[in-house]
């Protein structure tokens, strides 16, 4: 048996090849799969469950079919692009929403999973913005705005974020190693799986003097990648985006 982890597909109508690869992934990765965990940013942007494009509806349908036809559990942790995904869309997609930092036990192994943006403490401007956007009162007010206005605000936030990335160095946008260790020590785990940075890799490290691993599942811009947890091993799988064609 195995459990799969993906993140950062950033699905949108502008990149149909990624959507196609995701649907092929769901069609083919069914054998001996207990669960699929999506660690955020499945969509490029999400401004509320009341906005439904054809792609959003198709993704919900494909996910629900994947779960129900194959008896596979689906779990979701919000990303920085789609943290407004609510219970309504999650239910339609047969997904269970999880907290931003979540401890799970797989085949006798304790693992900490998260999107990963909370690990990037060097990006102080982003962390300030994140605190603001995750304020429940701010989210309540935002959801009360008309859809067209939310779209405009969402576009401005994304545009500002993309513009600032040009001037940020790689270290600022990467995880803060001390924060990784602190979090793993806090949760008493030797394995951490996350996304967000788009830097697919397995990092060997020490936590409380013991060997530990941090898996970055990567994004799907050029290749598809996922982490596969089995009883006796963990694999980081990287394949061409058209692998299932």
From Swiss-Prot:
Signal peptide region: none
Pfam families: Metallophos
GO CC annotation terms, alphabetical: cytoplasm; extrinsic component of plasma membrane
Keyword terms, alphabetized: Cell inner membrane, Cell membrane, Hydrolase, Lipid A biosynthesis, Lipid biosynthesis, Lipid metabolism, Manganese, Membrane, Metal-binding
Cofactor(s) for this UniProt protein: Mn(2+)
Residues noted as binding Mn(2+) 2 in the record, renumbered to the chain: 41, 80, 115, 196
MF-aspect GO terms: manganese ion binding; UDP-2,3-diacylglucosamine hydrolase activity
Positions that bind Mn(2+) 1: 8, 10, 41, 198
Topology of this chain in the membrane: Peripheral membrane protein
Record field: catalytic activity: UDP-2-N,3-O-bis[(3R)-3-hydroxytetradecanoyl]-alpha-D-glucosamine + H2O = 2-N,3-O-bis[(3R)-3-hydroxytetradecanoyl]-alpha-D-glucosaminyl 1-phosphate + UMP + 2 H(+)
Main location: membrane
One GO term of the biological process aspect: lipid A biosynthetic process
The record's free-text note on cofactor binding: Binds 2 Mn(2+) ions per subunit in a binuclear metal center.
HAMAP family: LpxH (MF_00575)
Function: Hydrolyzes the pyrophosphate bond of UDP-2,3-diacylglucosamine to yield 2,3-diacylglucosamine 1-phosphate (lipid X) and UMP by catalyzing the attack of water at the alpha-P atom. Involved in the biosynthesis of lipid A, a phosphorylated glycolipid that anchors the lipopolysaccharide to the outer membrane of the cell.
UniProt family annotation: Belongs to the LpxH family.
Protein name per UniProt: UDP-2,3-diacylglucosamine hydrolase
Organism: Psychromonas ingrahamii (strain DSM 17664 / CCUG 51855 / 37)
């Amino acid at each position: 048996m195995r459990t799969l982890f993906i993140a950062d597909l950033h699905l949108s109508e502008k990149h149909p090849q990624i959507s196609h690869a995701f649907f092929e992934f769901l069609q083919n990765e069914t054998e001996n799969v207990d669960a699929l965990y999506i660690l955020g940013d499945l969509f490029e942007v999400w401004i509320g469950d009341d906005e439904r494009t054809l792609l959003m509806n198709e993704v919900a349908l494909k996910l629900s079919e994947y779960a129900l036809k194959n008896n596979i559990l689906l779990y979701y942790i919000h990303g920085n692009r789609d943290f407004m995904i609510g219970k309504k869309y999650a239910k339609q997609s047969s997904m269970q929403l999880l907290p931003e930092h979540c401890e799970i036990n797989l085949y006798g192994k304790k693992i900490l999973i998260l999107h990963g943006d909370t690990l990037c403490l060097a990006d102080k401007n982003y962390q300030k913005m994140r605190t603001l956007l995750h304020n429940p009162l701010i989210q309540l007010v935002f959801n009360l705005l008309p859809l067209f206005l939310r779209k405009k605000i969402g576009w401005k936030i994304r545009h500002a974020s993309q513009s600032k990335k040009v001037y940020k160095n790689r270290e600022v946008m990467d995880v803060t190693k001390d924060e990784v260790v602190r979090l793993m020590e806090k949760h008493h785990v030797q394995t951490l799986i996350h996304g967000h940075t788009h830097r697919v890799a397995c990092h060997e490290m020490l936590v409380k003097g013991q060997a530990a691993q941090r898996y970055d599942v990567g994004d799907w811009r050029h290749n598809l990648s996922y982490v596969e947890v089995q009883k006796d091993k963990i694999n980081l799988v990287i394949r061409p985006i058209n692998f299932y064609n």
